Amino acid sequence: MTSTAPERFKMETNFEGLIKLLAEHLYSEPDVFVRELVQNASDSIVRRRRAEPDLAGRIEIKADPSTRTLRFRDNGLGMDRRDIREFLSVIGSSGTGTTRRELTGQGGAALELIGQFGIGMRSAFVVAERVVVRTRKVGEPRGFAWHNSGSVDCELYADAKEEVGTEIIVSVAPNYAFLLEESRLREVVVRYCEFIQFPVSVNGRGPVNAVEAPWHRAAWPSDEARAAGYEDFLNRRYPDLILDVIPVEVSGEYEARGALFISDRSLPDINTAGTVDIYVRRMLIRAGDDSLLPPWAKFVRGVIDTPDLCPTAAREQVQRTHPSFAHIQRRLGDCIVERLAYLAEFEPAKFERINRWHHYHLKGMAFHHEEFFERVVDLLLFETNRGMMSLARYVAEAAARTTEGRETPLYYFAYRGAATQFYRLAEARDLLVINAGYTFEEELLRKYAGRHAGRVRLERLDATDDPGLFGRLSESEQEQFRQLELDMEGHLLRSGAEEVRVQVRRFEPEDLPAVIIETAESEAERKLESRLTALALTDAFDDLAREALEQSRRRPRRLSLNASNPLVLRLLAEDRRNPLVREVMLGVYHSALLYSHNLLTPSNAEAVHGHLVRLCSMSLADGEALLRYRPEDEELDLVG
């Protein structure tokens, strides 16, 4: 019988290849090893200060281009033989992680530890031909040296190092010799290690790092001095005009400190995100991160320093799945909301300035945050036919035009492309109308009206046939215009226009011949068509969606002709069998499409273009066609 027992064996590992693989592919930038080695030095000093709290820690970096070497020195705790064998000679082992667990268990200062010594030091092999570690631990009679050239073989022996601490000597490969330039080193230290709590010098000059940020100060002489300190810090760091500063103090299960600010940057792209530089225990992990701030905080930038976010293995990103990420993101959102709500109540002039810069994004915040909505909704700005206007001002001005005791109408339209025609309609009737064409705006107006039921009523102009705007005709006028309605419907249908129901109303201004009003069905059709264009669907779903679209297209769109318009009155009087008159009827429809940009699809645009060319050609060919036309020349089958 054949044995079915599985074969067992150990996987073989190419240690030299593994070290190089980790070094070269874990880190995106070659100079990241400077950050890692400075982190190691800082953590070593933190460990020594547990027993010597008054120790003045220092970190020195020296470059020697002639020998292609970089030296990193610190006066930290140092290592003995056991530490070296455990943390330097075992791939994947981290002395800092072990010490952090010990300090946490003892209630110690684990929050000050930054890196992962055994893992982070491997980053040196991104650029190194060889790494030498010389170290002497506090209380030990002698030091040790460890050599490695990026292979499984390493050397460990006694060393005559006199001072306590560690020195790491990196022999830089020729193709990375540019990293030995002092200006480059200083730039790297400032970028990554600006807030390390110990001074870092480069070639004897320094400190290069700032050491402290405003949130590291234990006390300020006054609130004004604190605010000025934060603003000065941000002004030196960012080129933006700062509209307001938001100090961050998050405590509790997860902690974070830092400074956010509201920028003057214009944000036309709805996909723009607010960005922060993320520091973990004072060390830069990610610059310009666009994931930590809430999605609606698009106009906010700043710096966040936290001990609780978990860096990835390469320490160039944070783990978004860790519970700390969602918690800190939520608390940062709370800080932003609380600050803006405070400004709205106590510093309205500053809030109005921010509002004018970022009214769209503030409305997004109000949509997501109930408390923020309640506190600022009256101050939110909307575009109207009289310029930008807060809801409070709109309601006050509209109420002055409303009969006492009746609900104040809040007129709006939901498609920005229709602004021109509805602004003209509103101006002619001395009405205020809101352009609620951006995301959230219509929903916010509905929410606002719901809060003020009985006092305010919503009137959507682009989806209603309101008699207050579109006056009804008398019975005799209806009969007079009925044939024009039928003739125009028939000609539009034969011309390939989507199904349109023509109705005659009387509205102002008189020089506006026609407007198109959306029905709920035609609005749904347009949204469905837009999504079909944007989405890649499976064949089955695509067929189903397009069938639904075809069904919806059978529902007509309303074209309202203006009974007071001279051109419409001329069409009423002319013989509509005349080819030129028919082209004019089509032109009236196209003019309404052009006034409502949201309805101008590619197919509509092509039809408008073709009609214009055709009309121009007819005029050039025979400018007297209308005058010479005789009914007996041709018989046309018109509707009705």
Feature locations, PLM:
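GHKL/Bergerat-fold ATPase module in large chromosome/replication-associated machines
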Residues: 113, 134-153, 173-178, 183-640
